[in-house]
């Protein structure tokens, strides 16, 4: 074995410069002298081959160009946890001079010797380490725990540890470090490609106080998550992005305290996988960004009813997915606690070219939503969205069997499947009147654009802006636009306008359901906003 090469090098994580990888082979290579390490690199572009050389397969790689051979002296197998902490926080032996550890001091012509200065410096280091509560040793080449109980003696007050992007090879190493931290609450071991237990292990109290755990890019599977989770009795936040998790399983008797789950950047088999985690009783936030899901369905609840799945879910992120049908957005109204939604970059959003109408449709379809794509939904904006929705689809409602007379009102199942909230909106605002029922008008050149100046006369700090708006745009939609434009808090807007042709005359825009053209507004006029 080469000098300095760890006896357990095979299978361990290591680095060479800024590149990380796992040792898959230790030994000789044909027609060369000495020992070589066969490394499968995290970044395949760093490699040269699949583990074979001159017709001999020395090790296997997942990528055809993911492997190469390096000499042992080029490999860094890392340091123990405490060494990394001392290096990161400037508390190792090299910094002893700042504590005055020289043994002699000269006073004039006399040299005075101070006995025990080394031990004093060591005590001062101990005190400094014991004060650390939040510790980050990200990218510090940590590979093992070090001497037994050394961490617990030295860093007794740690609560939050960032161990991301190191050289940790197995979950056992994480346990060896964490078991010496009595009150560990937050642990980040992301970007360590490590081995996890494949069978049930003895449950220890290592993570008895752990509330936040990040395992992004660790190659953990959902089965391994559930096995390890037996030791996470009070965990509240679990981050699992970019782990190639495709299939979920029901978490029986584990993760019952979980409030946040991040599964982003894992290509789930289908949306039905979500049903397997739908009974987590305390889950409030679910992050499913870029998981490949194309539909969402809660089959236990009919139109207009609430599902028993995800009973506590308040915040849902489904952005960057393949959801193409509005029916999935309809389904989200079945979630009893949903308050915030992120859904950008899904194909269904391309079905409506006017972004204002798109936002209104989503708001109208999900009754309890308060935040959409990180923007607060104000009461006036919701009211306008629901009134417009009720009007836009009024003709479809009538043709499907809807009627102003409750006894004759029998819309078809097909209509209710497409517009499950429509009956509730009719109850809330009344059935639409015949004069309101105009077909949907796409925003085209036929809808004349008005160039208007928008001012806030009572708010001089707000600069006037110029906007182009279709003359068919209702006052309610204009208000929704202005709420976002001026970031106005939840209050009632009052709009009026001054004509460029009639100086000094101000006309109040007092009917939310009327379009701009109803008030004879023309390009060049000035809209005045007050609140």
Identify the function of each model-found stretch:
Residues 19-29:
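Short beta-strand-centered aromatic/proline hotspots
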Residues 9, 35, 57-70, 75-77:
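Histone-fold and other basic nucleic-acid-binding segments
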């Amino acid at each position: 074995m080469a000098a300095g090469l760890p006896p357990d090098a095979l299978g361990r994580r290591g680095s060479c410069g800024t590149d990380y990888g796992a040792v898959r082979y230790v030994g000789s290579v044909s027609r060369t002298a000495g020992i070589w390490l066969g490394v499968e690199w995290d970044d395949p572009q760093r490699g040269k081959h699949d583990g074979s050389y001159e017709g001999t397969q020395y090790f296997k790689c997942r990528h055809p160009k993911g492997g190469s051979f390096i000499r042992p002296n080029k490999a860094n197998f890392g340091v123990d946890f405490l060494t990394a902490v001392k290096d990161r926080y400037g508390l190792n032996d090299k910094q002893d001079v700042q504590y005055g550890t020289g043994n002699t001091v000269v006073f004039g012509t006399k040299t005075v010797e101070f006995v025990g200065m080394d031990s004093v410096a060591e005590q001062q280091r101990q005190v400094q380490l014991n004060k650390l509560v939040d510790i980050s040793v990200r990218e510090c080449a940590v590979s093992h725990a070090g001497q037994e109980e050394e961490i617990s003696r030295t860093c007794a007050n740690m609560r939050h540890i960032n161990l991301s992007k190191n050289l940790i090879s197995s979950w056992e190493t994480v346990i060896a470090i964490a078991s010496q931290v009595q009150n560990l609450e937050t642990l980040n071991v992301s970007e360590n490609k490590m081995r996890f237990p494949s069978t049930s292990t003895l449950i220890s109290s290592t993570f008895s106080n752990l509330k936040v755990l990040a395992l992004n890019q660790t190659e953990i599977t959902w089965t391994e998550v559930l096995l390890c989770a037996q030791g996470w009795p009070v965990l509240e936040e679990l981050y699992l992005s970019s782990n190639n998790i495709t299939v979920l399983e029901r978490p029986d008797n584990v993760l019952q305290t979980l409030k946040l789950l991040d599964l982003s950047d894992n290509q789930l088999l289908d949306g039905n996988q979500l049903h397997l985690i739908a009974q987590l009783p305390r889950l409030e936030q679910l992050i499913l960004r870029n998981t490949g899901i194309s539909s969402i369905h809660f089959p236990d609840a009919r139109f207009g009813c609430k599902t028993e799945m995800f009973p506590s879910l308040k915040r849902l992120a489904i952005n960057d997915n393949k959801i193409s049908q509005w029916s999935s957005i309809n389904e989200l109204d079945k979630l009893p606690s949903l308050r915030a939604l992120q859904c950008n970059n899904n194909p269904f959003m391309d079905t409506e070219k006017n972004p204002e109408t798109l936002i209104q449709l989503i708001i109208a379809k999900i009754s309890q939503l308060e935040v959409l794509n990180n923007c607060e939904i104000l009461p006036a904006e919701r009211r306008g969205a629901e009134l417009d929705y009720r009007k836009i689809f009024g003709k479809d409602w009538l043709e499907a069997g809807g009627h102003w007379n409750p006894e004759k009102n029998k819309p078809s199942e097909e209509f209710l499947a497409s517009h499950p909230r429509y009956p509730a909106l009719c109850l809330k605002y009344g059935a639409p009147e015949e004069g309101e029922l105009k077909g949907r008008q796409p925003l085209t050149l036929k809808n004349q654009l008005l160039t208007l100046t928008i001012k806030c006369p009572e708010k001089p700090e707000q600069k006037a802006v110029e906007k182009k708006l279709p003359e068919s745009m209702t006052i309610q939609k204009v208000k929704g636009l202005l709420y976002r434009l001026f970031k106005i808090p939840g209050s009632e807007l009052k709009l009026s306008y001054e004509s460029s042709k009639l100086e000094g005359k101000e006309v109040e825009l007092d009917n939310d359901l009327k379009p701009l053209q109803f008030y004879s507004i023309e390009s060049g006029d000035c809209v005045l906003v007050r609140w």
